[in-house]
């Protein structure tokens, strides 16, 4: 059986030769050079991913939603009852939540994964990878053991790779868990080195008079657990949560297949920071969807070196932003594969990247 280290070592490098070929192809399409902006850059990025074999395309699409409760909820860092995690997970099986509606619109399947919901029995219709009934309270103990974190990472990586074998070429990540912006902020603060006050936000509408307590909880969690910012697994195990571990696993699994994965919002940025500490080679496979409205979003994205494609003032989570951005990936593939070529129309354009083809 493969270990986590074995799987991390399988992540392929981006193919620069394929990207160069894609650049030449795109420059020869029926348009001024560079006139489709970031859509062109996205198509070139996709062409370099070995899992797509040099041709940007989208097969099956999947959004994987990692669901878990958090012991830190007991610290008063969220206003929603903890039971909402289980209720919303059930609603996802009915297709009635935000991510389900947006994923259906994008033609993507939603995989709802229980990695740590606090219920006596598993919830019917969910993929059961439950490690425990919620993580530990990071304000007074580690979220989980390193062994638990590594096993869950491995399980999710293997599940993601199996989906890729069955034709999924575009992944999105999402999460569900009351109070989970608190461990996410702890991860972002730890890895970026920024003070908790700079990255802690209101999450799901936390009243501003409770924000100081949330900042204090994050600071206490980091001080108590002393996560090593250079060790992504250590950070996740000490101040993270099962949902954050699960998202990191999807990213690592998709990258190990040479396939793109769309990030969602703030929670996914935190998971991506930890995943990149485990394997910097995954970064070219991470595609940002939207700019989360959560306070620490820009700090996390800047550290990752990523610029989102959308700014919709969204902070729902669930994978909603990832689902919303899937048509952008498909648009990049469409221009690459379906546009005509300048040479075929006997058009010669000067090397002016700002000119309009019709001017």
UniProtKB/Swiss-Prot annotation:
Gene3D superfamilies reported in the protein's UniProt record: 1.10.1610.10, 3.40.50.10210
GO BP terms in the entry: cobalamin biosynthetic process
Pfam families according to UniProt: DBI_PRT
Enzyme class label: transferase
GO terms of molecular function: nicotinate-nucleotide-dimethylbenzimidazole phosphoribosyltransferase activity
CDD domains: DMB-PRT_CobT
Record's keyword terms, sorted: Cobalamin biosynthesis, Glycosyltransferase, Transferase
EC assignment: 2.4.2.21
Superkingdom of origin: Bacteria
Residues annotated as the enzyme's active site: 318
Matching InterPro entries: Nict_dMeBzImd_PRibTrfase, Nict_dMeBzImd_PRibTrfase_bact, Nict_dMeBzImd_PRibTrfase_N, Nict_dMeBzImd_PRibTrfase_sf
Catalyzed reaction equations: 5,6-dimethylbenzimidazole + nicotinate beta-D-ribonucleotide = alpha-ribazole 5'-phosphate + nicotinate + H(+)
Pathway annotation: Nucleoside biosynthesis; alpha-ribazole biosynthesis; alpha-ribazole from 5,6-dimethylbenzimidazole: step 1/2
Assembly: Homodimer.
Family: Belongs to the CobT family.
Job of this protein: Catalyzes the synthesis of alpha-ribazole-5'-phosphate from nicotinate mononucleotide (NAMN) and 5,6-dimethylbenzimidazole (DMB).
Protein name (Swiss-Prot/TrEMBL): Nicotinate-nucleotide--dimethylbenzimidazole phosphoribosyltransferase
Gene that this polypeptide is encoded by: cobT
